[in-house]
Amino acid sequence: MSMLESFFDIQKDNKALFEELEIAKRHELCMEWMNQWPVMSLSLKAVEGNDFSTAYMQLVYEVGELFKKHEYLMESPVLNAEEKKKFDDIRYGRAGKIEVMRSLQILSEFLSKYYNKSVILLIDEYDVPMARATSNGYYKEMLEIMKGFMQALKDNQCIKLAVITSCLKIAKESIFTGTNNFVSNTITSSRLNEYYGFVQNEVDRILEDAEIKGKGDIMKKWYDGYHFGDVDVYCPCDVMCYVDNLQKNPNAKPDEYWKDTSDNAIIRSFIDYAGASITKKLETLMNGGYIIQRVDENLTYDYLHSSEENLWSLMYLTGYLTQVRDYKIDDQIIRDEAQEQ
C-alpha cells in the first residue's frame, strides 16, 4: 500500500523511485497517475483491544493521525471556519462518534475541495477491527462503527477509486451494504497474481544482482509458500531480509522474519476445540502431506464459527495453506508457525 501511496500522492515527487522500473516505460499512464492525485492512506491493523472502548479509541487515534497528514488544509481559505473546527476536532480526538464514523467522507470532501480533484482512498487491513471484535466479544458494537466508517465508499463523488486489503473477501458483510462496483481480487484470482509478491524470475534476478550464489533452493524451500491464481509467489519481506543477511554473512541461515507479524487468535480458537477429523487433517499437513477440502471465499467474521470446517477456508485465506493441485502447507516458515498454534 505504501508503494501505491508513493505512486499516486500529489504531495510527493517520486519519479526517481520508479524511473528504472517497468511502469516508467508507460509514459502516458505515468503522466496521468504518478503523483497526480490526493491520497488518503490508512491502516487499521492497530485497531484492536480486549474491549470495545479500547479498540474504538485506537480507531480515533488512527483517524487523527490521518488528518494530521493533511494539516495544511487548516491554513487554506478553501475551508470555512466551521469546516476547520470539524477538522480540528477529528485531528485531536475531540469529535463525537458520528463525526468519527463519517471522518473518511469528511476528509475526502475537504481534499477534493482543496485540490479540485477526486481522491484515492487506500485502506490496509480493513477487517482487523472485525477480527479482533469477533475474538473479544464486541462484534456488534464494532460492526456499527465500521459500517458508518465505510459509508465513505457509498455514492461518494469525491472518491476516484479505493484500494482495500483484507484477509477475508469483501463480500456479504453488512459493513458494505449499499456499496457497489467492488472488484475483488482473491488469492485464487489471476488478474493481479504476480504484482503483490515476488515471482520466480524476480527472485532469481534479486539473487543475481546481489551476487548471491547457491541459495536458490533454500530460498524456495523457506519462502516460496504461496500460490496466487496460477503463479507461485514468494513473500517479499522474507526474501529481502534474507538477502540482506546473506550480503552481510554469506553463511547466514534462513530465519522466520514473518513470524509474529499477525494475530492468530481466531485460528487458535478453532484448533483448541478441534474434533478428531480436523486433528487428523492437521497432522497430515504438519507431515508435509495434502488434503482435499472445499474452501469458501465468502466467509464473514460473524459466521466463522458456524462450522469447524471453516477452519480450512480461514487458513487458506490467511496464508497458512496454499494450493498446489491440492491444499498443503508449502512453506517452511508457515509449517513452523502452524505447529506452534
Named regions from a protein language model:
Residues 1-341:
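Phosphate-binding site recognition
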